[in-house]
């Protein structure tokens, strides 16, 4: 915005150059300094506010919350205290988070097995929780999801060479974490049903 001054009514002292606004990096550095300077209850309350705002957006793992609070300048001790308190209140539960996250990834993207395990470990979840959540996925449900994904992919393929189709379907299912025996079974059934349709 341009500011116009009347030279007859405005003195030079009144005309100051506009202060430069801080860049996002400068604002973040200033915020980290302020948060690091906080102590005791003030630090706990400010860190808790950060965690609650994060939880307002979506459920988070304890690791994600701790990373967010420490990246904002709070000590890891303060972050752990806040997480402990939120866990006591039932607002943070890694097992419930892992179940919901895995269910969402499985239903929306069809991920399972090693691909889902990798996604869960990125969230900072323990190997025990990951193993428990992965064991809860039903084999029949996994097979039907793999079948649906492969069927959808097969419709989009324009090639007619069976080996190319087999390779592309197998690699797509393997990237999503399906076991080789599931991939082979699904692909064989799809190719067999396609052969029957052509007769």
Question: What role is predicted for each listed range?
Answer:
Residues 1-199:
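An alpha-helical, amphipathic repeat domain used for nucleic-acid recognition
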């Amino acid at each position: 915005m341009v500011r116009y001054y009347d030279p007859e009514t405005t003195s030079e002292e009144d005309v100051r150059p506009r202060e430069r606004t801080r860049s996002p990096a400068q604002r973040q550095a200033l915020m980290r300094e302020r948060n690091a300077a906080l102590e005791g209850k003030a630090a706990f309350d400010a860190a808790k506010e950060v965690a609650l705002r994060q939880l307002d957006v979506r459920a988070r793992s304890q690791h994600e919350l701790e990373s967010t609070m420490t990246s904002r300048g709070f000590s890891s001790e303060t972050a752990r205290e806040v997480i402990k308190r939120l866990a006591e209140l039932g607002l943070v539960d890694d097992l419930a988070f892992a179940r919901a996250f895995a269910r969402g990834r499985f239903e929306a993207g069809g991920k399972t097995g090693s691909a889902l395990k990798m996604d869960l470990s990125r969230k900072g979840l323990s190997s025990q929780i990951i193993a428990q959540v992965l064991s809860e996925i039903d084999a029949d449900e996994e097979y039907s999801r793999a079948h649906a994904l492969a069927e959808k992919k097969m419709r989009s393929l324009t090639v007619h060479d069976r080996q190319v189709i087999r390779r592309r379907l197998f690699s797509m299912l393997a990237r999503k974490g399906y076991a080789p025996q599931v991939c082979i079974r699904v692909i064989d059934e799809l190719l067999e049903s396609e052969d029957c349709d052509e007769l």
